[in-house]
Amino acid sequence: MRKDDLCITVPTFFRCPISLDVMKSPVSLCTGVTYDRASIQRWLDGGNNTCPATMQILQNKDFIPNRTLQRLIEIWSDSVRRRTCVESAELAAPTRDEIADAIDRVKIEKEERDDREVLSKIVRFGRESDDNRGFLAGKDDFVKLLVDLINQVDFETTSAAKSLVVQEAVKILSTIRSKVSDRRRFSNLILTNGRDRLSVIVYLFKTGNVELKIDCAGLLEFIAVDAESKLLIAERDGLITELMKSISKDSDLSLIESSLSCLIAISSPKRVKLNLLREKLIGDVTKLLSDSTSSLSVSVTEKCLKLLEILASTKEGRSEICGGDGECLKTVVKKLMKVSTAATEHAVTVLWSVSYLFKEDKALEAVTSVNGVTKILLLLQSNCSPAVRRMLTDLLKVFKVNSRSCLSAYDTKTTHIMPF
């Protein structure tokens, strides 16, 4: 239940001017102001002879019951109680038996009725627990049923109600994907003999709200199981552009994370990498990493660095990473420490790729300009993995060969850890 669901707005004229509570027995004084009987009685019993709201002297202390207002308050109170009961029933997690019946209903009548309400109930059930997600994923032909629902829509001609049904189906597929035992078969259901299903998911990612975008990105990430599926997804019109819009600093943090995960999942084919570079992904990732006004989660930082690591495997990517004034590499150096072990490994791999493996001259200048050598030396003293230690050692060799002066400032304090 959301916080807003707990707030009930009470009409001002239903409140007693003294207690500010909803009046149980409204009565009016000779001044025309209405109070709750108990509150105004206490006021008068206290020796007061004025109207509390107007401070006029009371000509008499007679109470006139306000029957009309009392009836309005009763009607309003009944409606609030009914609405609260309905909302509580809707928000309560359905049982497995109820869900099994709901699934059977969708199977039998999927062509004849609006199943949005039923599917919404299944979404709530799936998001309730890991066991529930496993239960849904294990239901015979349920996944295929949901995929078939997606295949039945054409957003140019389909009714709004049917479109909402498809959205709920996508939410369920995204919710239960981690419990699907055969990921490749799941991917084939969506991608094989039904390219329109992929178009629907991409369309929903482009046009949906934040929650739906996150579900679509997660689903696309999950079905990217091999080079063929990655290419099919990445080359769908407008998807990469939309994913890149979703990683802007102004986007929802969860959407940024899911979009980065999707980009990582589809980026391994070289054709996709080159497409990402043409779309200036490195610039967008650099802006995201270097933005001092936003507090990125550790996970988002790791994913940004992972993307840079992937793109650094191409000549064009390395050129872009080292381009301009070296802002991208400088940002990577700043993320070498104090983020996480995974972030350190990705950042070191980026530096190793451009500086040691492919010996980009601009990389050496950028790294030394932000005291990168100091951080490399400090990392060698840390509890890093053997693979990272080897890359750090290689980096120091490159810096020593290319410019002994960049190490001279650190000789007195760090010579004891020099690996050569």
From Swiss-Prot:
One Pfam family named in its UniProt record: U-box
Repeat positions for ARM: 130-178, 184-225, 228-268, 270-313
Record-annotated U-box domain positions: 9-83
The protein's Enzyme Commission number: 2.3.2.27
Pathway annotation: Protein modification; protein ubiquitination
Catalysed reactions, semicolon-separated: S-ubiquitinyl-[E2 ubiquitin-conjugating enzyme]-L-cysteine + [acceptor protein]-L-lysine = [E2 ubiquitin-conjugating enzyme]-L-cysteine + N(6)-ubiquitinyl-[acceptor protein]-L-lysine
Function of the protein: Functions as an E3 ubiquitin ligase.
Protein name: U-box domain-containing protein 27
Organism field: Arabidopsis thaliana
Source organism phylogeny: Eukaryota, Viridiplantae, Streptophyta, Embryophyta, Tracheophyta
